[in-house]
Amino acid sequence: NLFAVAGTILVNSGTGEVMRVTADSTATGLTVERNIGGTSHTIADAAELFIAGSAYEEGANSPTGVSFDATVATNYTQIFRTAFKVTETLRATNLRTGDKEDEMATKALKLHMQDIERAMFFGKKHESNGTSAQPRRFTGGLTTQITNVLDRTSASGVMTEDQFDRALIEDIFAFGSKQKIMFCGAKVAGHLQKFGKDRWQPTVVEGTYGVNLTQYATFAGDLMVHLHPQFRQVPGMANAAVIIDFPYLKYRYLDGRDTSLLRDRQAADEDAVKHEFLTECGLEMMQDKTHAYIKNWNNIA
């Protein structure tokens, strides 16, 4: 009785019977007034009831307060470091391709951001050496934290267009925003392309979220699809897709520990310069049910 207190109206979805809660004195039980309005319904075991407002007599005292017991979810920030080195000889060499130090800095930054992005997808929440003065922490990623998983292994890797539609309407858009982003692998993109040719008429929306997305409209919401380049490189992700509700995700970093370039990390007697990019960040996931993870989707029929 977290939400059903004395005065709450309950409806039996199977019979239409309306009941009013008259007492909520125990943690797991309710006393109700049956058959409001003069009906004469019976109630079966395991009948499904839902709350349909409340009704109180004139001059009544205030009802019992309802309870809200939120589930606590945690994650860690992870330290990412990408160093690069240029010898003093190379720095002093006039190269046709331009400044080597700048070139290596650009490449190192790309690798650094790729490391962070992959951790946001595939990282596993963990802490090692937790009792020491120098613990090592790993941030949990999307694929390891999302509990709304549609694994097609039990269906021989098959999900038809009708099954996909039902998953969107009944599961994926059941909670959260009416627009979500699907990052998918090449095989999943091929499945969706076949669906789109038959019915959906996909429309390209340019510049959204910094990438080009293809919009699929459904009765439940709009699915914005992007063939993720990382999923081409990561084994096992060609037949997978991660569906994200961005308002319920946050990139978190410690104060002063967002991505920065730290210069001159070389030893004092080293004939080279060494710099590194360093970030201490993690992923905050709110309302886990708003996201989804599809995997092992090999065929559509």
Question: Where in this protein do the model-derived segments appear?
Answer:
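Flexible, glycine/threonine- and acidic-rich loop/arm segments that mediate assembly and lattice contacts
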Residues: 1-5, 14-218, 222, 228-301
